[in-house]
Design a protein with these regions (language model features):
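Conserved beta-strand/loop scaffold segments within soluble protein domains that form the structured core
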Residues: 116-380, 394, 401-423
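Short, low-to-moderate order helix/coil transition modules at the start of elongated helical scaffolds
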Residues: 1-202, 210-212
Length: 423
């Protein structure tokens, strides 16, 4: 079994956590576990894992705790947002902390039925881990032509434990957005305390013909957390999906978005903003398959890297042989705020069709001294000038948020991670 020197110990622990549930695990979860054990954990020698440090994670003692929190603890971490909220604590759904969904336009069932869930677009070891260890699946449906008045908020609260142990929590959701339906879904990840924990997340979304999805992910976990996520989007003809991810917290945060455009005239937007600080690593990955013609995609991924932080971007657009009139663009812009900050970027195109319009690009730079001088000459001090430029750099992402209150809360989180703190 290939992998890190201590990977077998981590795999054995995860196997033990799986077996602790006895016969509760579905056949599909068992298959994912077997695939995980066969594959093993990657090393830095694997190209796709070259910049994602796993040593600190796999040397841990993993536990799975069923924590309880009060409504007051939930509220202290919650977004101020008029929404239909489902609350999950340490990988488990908590009805007492969640809103009722009757009459909301969202049909929700929570069980371990995994039949009919889509296959992974791009499977890898941590996807198999989450699929095997997730306690249940949250099945969400918006029926044909329905347009729920409120967004659906999936709030995930994970707590760390004292000492050497690491609480591991895995969340598995699936959304079916039926023909002509329209919905906004928000994933919110937070930490209950400042101790280490490991979060695994998996969200698959079917966007049917003429349906419209607004998806927002807010990863606001603590500086010691590890977070590995895999989101799959599948779009039918004339479907639209906008996905905005704000990756603002975690020692190691790796977020994968994989998409298939399986119907003509579908439209996709994927935006992300990552802000690793101190020694944090944030790894953003996208995989996009243009499988049908006349589709349009735009991706804009930005990072602001401070101190000794590291940002990684790896994105690929694949245009199938008969996907004519494809229009796909992918851009990665990176702003370095520290002398030891690092960025590794790899946008890629694979085109097998004629008559397409595709492009990719990446930029890496620092704040222009002339910009600082211009603002200083107008009476703005050095730190305020620097922060104004950073906010302007991030604005292209935050302005995509329709709800003004939510936008202000994201901006506040950004401010907490700025050099010198928010002003």
């Amino acid at each position: 079994m290939a992998g890190l020197p201590n990977s077998s110990n981590a795999l054995q622990q995860w196997h033990h956590l799986f077996e602790a549930e006895g016969t509760k695990r579905s056949p599909q979860a068992q298959q994912h576990l077997q695939q995980l054990l066969r594959t093993g954990l990657p090393t830095r020698k694997h190209e796709n894992w070259k910049y994602t440090p796993l040593e600190g994670l796999i040397n841990s003692q993993f536990v799975s705790i069923a924590g309880e929190i009060s409504p007051q603890q939930r509220d202290a971490l919650a977004l101020t947002l008029d929404s239909v909220r489902l609350v999950f604590v340490d990988g488990r759904y908590v009805p007492a902390l969640s809103d009722a969904t009757e009459g909301s336009g969202y049909e929700v069932s929570i069980n371990d039925d995994r039949q009919g869930l889509p296959d992974a677009i791009q499977a890898e070891v941590f996807l198999h881990l989450t699929e095997s260890l997730a306690q249940s699946v949250t099945h969400i449906a918006v029926k044909r032509g329905q347009r729920p008045a409120k967004p659906l908020l999936l709030m995930h609260i994970t707590q760390g434990v004292a000492g050497e142990e690491v609480n591991t929590a895995h969340y598995r959701h699936h959304l079916d957005l039926a023909e002509g339906a329209e919905a906004t879904v928000i994933e919110h990840f937070v930490s209950l305390n400042d101790a280490r924990h490991f979060t695994g997340a998996r969200f698959t979304i079917n966007v049917a013909a003429n349906a419209h999805l607004q998806h927002i992910k807010l990863a606001f976990e603590n500086p010691l957390s590890h977070h590995f996520a895999h989101n799959d989007l599948l779009l039918a003809e004339d479907a639209t999906a906008f996905s905005h991810s704000f990756l603002l917290g975690g020692a190691v945060l790796r977020h994968n978005t994989s998409t298939q455009l399986n119907g003509e005239n579908s439209t996709l937007r994927i935006n992300s903003l990552a802000m690793p600080v101190k020694n944090e690593v944030c790894d953003t990955r996208t995989w996009l398959e243009h499988n049908k013609g006349f589709c349009n995609s735009r991706q804009l991924h930005k990072t602001i890297v401070s101190d000794k932080g590291r940002a990684v971007f790896n994105g690929l657009i694949n245009v199938a042989q008969h996907a004519i009139k494809t229009d796909g663009q992918m851009t990665n812009n990176n702003l370095l705020m520290g002398k030891l900050a690092e960025v590794d970027t790899k946008p890629q195109l694979e085109i097998y069709a004629d008559d397409v319009k595709c492009s990719h690009g990446a930029t890496v730079g620092r704040i222009d001294d002339e910009q600082i001088f211009y603002l200083r000459s107008r009476g703005i001090n050095q730190q305020d000038a620097q922060q104004m430029i950073i906010y302007a750099f991030a604005a292209e992402q935050t302005e995509a948020l329709r709800d003004e209150g939510l936008k202000q809360q994201v901006l506040a989180r950004i401010g907490q991670r700025l050099p010198g703190g928010a002003r």
